[in-house]
C-alpha cells in the first residue's frame, strides 16, 4: 500500500481462508480496500512501498571479531568475502550465520558444488543458536541450487532469496541474506 489508510473494520477472531476479507481500509479519498491473507511478492521487481529508503547507520554485529573490526558492515548494508577455492569462505559464512544479530538467516547456495551444499544441509541442523540455545535451523532458510543444475535455476535462487528477505524485512525482522557463490551466479 502507498499512502495513508484508516482501518474501517477488522474481522473477528476465528478460522478463515486466505480469500476471506480480514480488514477493510479506507484511503484519503474514501475508497475502500479489502485486505485478505493473500500476498504477492514479485521476484524481479523493485520494492517501492517506502517513500524514502533510510540510510544505514547501525553496525551489524556479525559475531566474527575480525570482520566487525577490520571490515564492519552496517545493518542494511552489503559485505563480501573474496577469495580463491578452499580458503574458508563457506566456513566464515557458517560462523556469521551462527553468531550474527539477526532474526532470520537466508542462505542462497547458488552454483555451489554438490558436496558443499550437502555439507550445509548436514551441518546446519546440528548447529545451536548461541542467542536462543535452540537449533539454528529454526531461523534459517536455505535455497540450494548446485553447479550442475540449469543456469536459470541458479539465477532464480538469488532472486528468490532476496524476495524472501524482503518479505521478512517488511515484517520488521532483522534479516541476514547471504549468497554463496555470487561469482558462479554471475556466470
Predicted feature locations:
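A structural micro-motif recognizing beta-strand termini
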Residues: 7-13
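P-loop NTPase nucleotide-binding/switch module
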Residues: 1-7, 18-83, 90-95, 130-149, ...
Amino acid at each position: 500500500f502507498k499512502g495513508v489508510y484508516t482501518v474501517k473494520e477488522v474481522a473477528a477472531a476465528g478460522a478463515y481462508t486466505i480469500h476471506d476479507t480480514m480488514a477493510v481500509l479506507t484511503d484519503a479519498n474514501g475508497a475502500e480496500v479489502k485486505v485478505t491473507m493473500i500476498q504477492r511478492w514479485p521476484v524481479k521487481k523493485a520494492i517501492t512501498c517506502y517513500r524514502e529508503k533510510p540510510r544505514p547507520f547501525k553496525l551489524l554485529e556479525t559475531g566474527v571479531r575480525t570482520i566487525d573490526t577490520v571490515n564492519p558492515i552496517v545493518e542494511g548494508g552489503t559485505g563480501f568475502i573474496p577469495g580463491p577455492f578452499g580458503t574458508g569462505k563457506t566456513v566464515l559464512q557458517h560462523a556469521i550465520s551462527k553468531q550474527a544479530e539477526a532474526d532470520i538467516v537466508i542462505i542462497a547456495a547458488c552454483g555451489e558444488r554438490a558436496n558443499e551444499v550437502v555439507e550445509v544441509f548436514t551441518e546446519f541442523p546440528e548447529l545451536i543458536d548461541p542467542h536462543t540455545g535452540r537449533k539454528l535451523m529454526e531461523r534459517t532458510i536455505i535455497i540450494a541450487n548446485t553447479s550442475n543444475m540449469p543456469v536459470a535455476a541458479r539465477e532464480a535462487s538469488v532472486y528468490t532469496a532476496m524476495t524472501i528477505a524482503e518479505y521478512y524485512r517488511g515484517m520488521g525482522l532483522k534479516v541476514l541474506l547471504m549468497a554463496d557463490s555470487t561469482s558462479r551466479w554471475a556466470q
